[in-house]
């Protein structure tokens, strides 16, 4: 008996079925959350000298120079030592300079590359440096509790927070309190976002307590603006148009370690899995194949999809899809609302992953 199914005139589909994200319900213990607070695989090997500043954007070279000096100033017994204070003294005349740096810029200008390079360049053992997204940091607090998180991170020289965008007043108060405690313990901070610290949460919440927390949070950082075009698409061909359901299905069966799900079912499954587990959801995947991609129906669903897109991008997992193109995932209302920066980042990252997946389809 044949071990494959064939369509006349086309190559056979292997009998072994692809994986399914919808069949996965990962459990992530707290110790894994702590152990994984390192730069993701995409940024394992990045360094300051592998960042290529755009000569038309002097802010990019300035950011490399400033961050290199910041990393050098974190040597010594602890991040609260005099070396760090001297570094900030050279940069600002204020008597109480901020104890962190904040990389603000558009999509794809290399902020995460620079943040990971800072982590790698800081002269401390990996166990004394932490790197994670804002979502991962709040998940860590949820898993360990506030006091234990302070205790776990207070001995670190550096905490790097990627994608620092505050969408919830409760998270704002939580993280502001956490960072204030860590600063008191001498932990240096570095963060990236598409929004300056003083503007975090703008247009989303107007409560006085929320605004007060934002102002207190911004005082911990020295902003560094990084200008430039999205490097993920710089000089590259356009992302491929969506494929057919049949092409995506065949590619999933032909690619070892690929998953295959229809998009509506995946969105429903994401609602049942905590975002802290989305990274584990993609463990050992070589490609994600999606059929029936369509515009997301509501903001809660869209925000969950953003987190999944970030985890796939971090892990360099190609995404092959049929249906609507990724730049049509979010409505005009979403792209003009308070979460628009998240949505544009997701479009940029998914487009890059779609380009990576093009070779999975037989020509």
Regions found by a protein language model. Give the residues of each.
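Hydrophobic anchor at the beta1->P-loop junction of P-loop NTPases
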Residues: 101-103
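Terminal-proximal interaction/regulatory segments of ATP-powered molecular machines
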Residues: 288-363
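Hydrophobic positions on the alpha1 helix immediately C-terminal to the Walker A/P-loop
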Residues: 114, 118
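A short, basic N-terminal segment
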Residues: 1-91, 219, 225
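Conserved nucleotide-sensing/catalytic segment adjacent to the nucleotide-binding pocket
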Residues: 142-187
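Conserved lysine of the Walker
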Residues: 111
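Conserved helicase/translocase motor-coupling segment
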Residues: 255-314
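AAA+/P-loop NTPase substrate/partner-engagement loops
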Residues: 121-155
């Amino acid at each position: 008996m044949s071990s494959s199914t064939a369509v006349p005139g086309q190559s056979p589909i292997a009998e072994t079925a692809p994986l399914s994200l919808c069949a996965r319900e990962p459990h992530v213990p707290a110790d894994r959350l702590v152990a994984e607070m390192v730069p993701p695989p995409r940024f394992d090997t990045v360094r300051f000298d592998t960042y290529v500043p755009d000569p038309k954007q002097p802010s990019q070279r300035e950011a490399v120079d400033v961050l290199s000096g910041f990393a050098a100033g974190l040597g010594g017994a602890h991040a609260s030592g005099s070396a760090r204070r001297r570094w900030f003294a050279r940069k600002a005349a204020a008597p109480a300079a901020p104890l962190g740096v904040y990389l603000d810029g558009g999509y794809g200008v290399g902020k995460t590359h620079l943040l990971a390079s800072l982590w790698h360049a800081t002269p401390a053992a990996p166990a004394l440096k932490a790197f994670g997204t804002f979502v991962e940091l709040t998940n860590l607090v949820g898993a360990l509790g506030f006091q234990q998180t302070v205790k776990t991170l207070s001995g670190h020289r550096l905490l790097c927070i990627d994608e620092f965008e505050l969408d919830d007043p409760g998270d704002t108060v939580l993280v502001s309190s956490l960072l204030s405690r860590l600063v008191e313990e001498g932990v240096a901070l570095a963060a990236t976002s598409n929004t300056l610290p003083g503007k975090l949460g703008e247009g989303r919440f107007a409560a006085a307590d929320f605004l007060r927390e934002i102002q207190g949070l911004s005082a911990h950082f020295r902003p560094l603006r990084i200008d430039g075009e999205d490097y993920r698409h710089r000089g590259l061909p356009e992302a491929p148009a969506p494929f057919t359901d049949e092409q995506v299905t065949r590619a999933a069966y032909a690619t070892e370690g690929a998953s295959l799900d229809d998009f509506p079912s995946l969105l429903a499954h994401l609602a049942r899995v905590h975002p802290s587990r989305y990274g584990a959801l993609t463990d050992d995947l070589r490609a994600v194949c999606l059929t029936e991609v369509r515009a997301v129906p509501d903001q809660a669903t869209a925000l969950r999809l953003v987190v999944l897109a970030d985890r796939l991008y971090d892990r360099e997992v190609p995404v092959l899809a049929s249906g609507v193109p990724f730049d049509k995932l979010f409505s005009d209302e979403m792209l003009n609302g308070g979460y628009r920066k998240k949505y544009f980042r997701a479009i940029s990252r998914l487009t890059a992953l779609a380009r990576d997946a093009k070779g999975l389809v037989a020509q």
